[in-house]
Amino acid sequence: MRAPGAAEMLDLWDRSSGKTPIEKSMELLSLASPEGDPAGLSIGRRDACLFRLRERFFGPLFSNIADCPSCGERVEWSGNIRDLLVDGEEKEGVFTLYAASYVILFRLPNSYDLMNAAAYRDHSEWLLRDCILEARKQDAYCDVADLPEDVFDLLDRRMAEEDPQADISMLLSCAKCAHQWEMPFDIGSYLWMEIDSWAKRVLRE
């Protein structure tokens, strides 16, 4: 994976106008790794690549803001990209979930799955369904639509265990009211916000 130059980044920024955050992340990773298919990576592997690209572009340190959900106070916070990279082997392939009398073969979600699931109101369940390769109950094949809700709950938790990089949250604290909360950190949206600010600044100079 390489770090694209300034001219390439400006061109990418210009032609990505109007695209969704996921599509923008895919364009960026395709530019950095033209030989691969970034949309086919698990969400964790995709985000790990985005974290590393962010460090190459802007360095390891970052800052952000959030509004306290309790009192509305603006909270400023900062961190280090390297602290958000999960240690351990990046997993791919087929996994097996044993849930009571059910045996589920599944893979980890990727960006294709996220884009497909976005079309449904209950996108979380559709995302899980897309990743089930085979479902059996007492050695007989069964339809994914017939699986009970608790099996989907177990599958959701198991996917989170297998791909922890896919769900990064920051523990924030409000200095005004002392409220603490966890806020999801979406590296794709954050990185593109930085690229957008950088591109506009370059064009003004």
Task: Map each language-model feature to its residues.
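Long C-terminal interaction/binding lobes of large macromolecular proteins
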Residues: 1-205
